[in-house]
UniProtKB/Swiss-Prot annotation:
List of residues binding N-[(5S)-5-amino-5-carboxypentanoyl]-L-cysteinyl-D-valine: R87, Y91, S183, Y189, H212, D214, S279
GO terms (BP aspect): antibiotic biosynthetic process
Family as reported in the entry's similarity comment: Belongs to the iron/ascorbate-dependent oxidoreductase family.
Function: Removes, in the presence of oxygen, 4 hydrogen atoms from delta-L-(alpha-aminoadipyl)-L-cysteinyl-D-valine (ACV) to form the azetidinone and thiazolidine rings of isopenicillin.
Organism taxonomic ancestry: Bacteria, Bacillati, Actinomycetota, Actinomycetes, Kitasatosporales
Name this polypeptide is given: Isopenicillin N synthase
Swiss-Prot/TrEMBL cofactor(s): Fe cation; L-ascorbate
Binding site for Fe(2+): H212, D214, H268
Ranges where the Fe2OG dioxygenase domain occurs: 180-286
Reaction(s) the record says it catalyses: N-[(5S)-5-amino-5-carboxypentanoyl]-L-cysteinyl-D-valine + O2 = isopenicillin N + 2 H2O
Native organism: Streptomyces clavuligerus
Amino-acid positions noted as binding 2-oxoglutarate in the UniProt annotation, renumbered to this chain: R277
Record carries keyword Iron: yes
Length: 329
């Protein structure tokens, strides 16, 4: 059962001290992160150093230029049986059934010579990209953005480590860049005169995506300013505000697992809004063989009750379960 969050408050936290060397300032940020993760489970990270206007420009340009044939050629196996990829690729809209479309890509370090690729390890794929003559700046931007977001997310994890009473670099080994299973999804929700049928929540709320817990270590999301997200609290579903320039951060189920739900994965859902908008999550994941032993965070009253779980097994089973529960995105 999901944890019902005690609050709907989503604070904005200046994370710039986490990039510096002032231990006292880092501790103050960690205290704010602690309050957010124990409150609504969400916070906005500001002063993050990412050019979000360029991000929107590149993604809008990409979605506007993609042809139907390009979308099919890049589509994952669920939409194109000729493509064996199940993670990297295009997630197509289906006329009359599904309006949302997206492109997901993985670690740029996953080349044919990467040991996990060579071994055919699940969840590892060499990225497919659209034609570089038609989309000249897309791949270079995306690869740079992936590395920038991995660095930002690793810095955030250092703040979470301090918030949990652990050494600052407690999570670093599990997040090594060359093996990271992290992913970026470039999701477009269109405005349509005639929208396909959408789901309805138990409370009557129309939904673009039903309630779920993120399969990640943490999720770091930028989205355009159309309010759509809700978090489940002890008082029911409550709206999460938007932000023009900041990243929305929440814990995924691996963080919940290793902290015994001290930092839970908040249950959340996407309201149906017929408006053109972008949702651009970075899902921070560890390497396939990474294992973080569950521990008792500083200040927690319970003992460790979860077993150690390799990140590869966690991710493979978690993503499969999410598709079974909520359908193919």
């Amino acid at each position: 059962m999901p944890v019902l969050m005690p609050s709907a408050h989503v604070p904005t936290i200046d994370i710039s001290p986490l990039f510096g060397t002032d231990a006292a300032a880092k501790k103050r940020v960690a205290e704010e992160i602690h309050g957010a993760c124990r409150g609504s489970g969400f916070f906005y990270a500001t002063n993050h150093g990412v050019d979000v206007q360029q991000l929107q420009d590149v993604v809008n340009e990409f979605h506007g230029a993609m042809t139907d044939q390009e979308k099919h050629d890049l589509a994952i196996h669920a939409y194109n049986p000729d493509n064996p990829h199940v993670r990297n690729g295009y997630y197509k809209a289906v006329p009359g059934r599904k309006a949302v479309e997206s492109f997901c890509y993985l670690n740029p370090d996953f080349g044919e010579d990467h040991p996990m690729i060579a071994a055919g390890t699940p969840m590892h794929e060499v990225n497919l990209w659209p034609d570089e003559e038609r989309h000249p700046r897309f791949r270079p931007f995306c690869e740079g953005y992936y590395r920038q977001m991995l660095k930002l997310s690793t810095v955030l994890m250092r703040g979470l480590a301090l918030a949990l009473g652990r050494p600052e670099h407690f999570f670093d080994a599990a997040l090594a860049e060359q093996d990271s299973l992290s992913s970026v999804s470039l999701i477009r929700y269109p405005y349509l005169e005639e929208y396909p049928p959408v789901k309805t929540g138990p409370d009557g709320q129309l939904l673009s995506f039903e309630d779920h817990l993120d399969v990640s270590m943490i999720t770091v999301l930028f989205q355009t300013q159309v309010q759509n997200l809700q978090v489940e609290t002890v008082d029911g579903w409550r709206d999460i505000p938007t932000s023009e320039n900041d990243f929305l951060v929440n814990c995924g189920t691996y963080m919940a697992h290793v902290t015994n739900d001290y930092f839970p994965a908040p249950n959340h859902r996407v309201k149906f809004v017929n408006a053109e908008r972008l949702s651009l999550p970075f899902f921070l994941n560890g390497g396939h063989e990474a294992v973080i032993e569950p521990f008792v965070p500083e200040g927690a009253s319970e003992e460790v009750r979860n077993e150690a779980l390799s990140y590869g097994d966690y991710l493979q089973h978690g993503l499969r379960a999410l598709i079974v529960k909520n359908g193919q995105t």
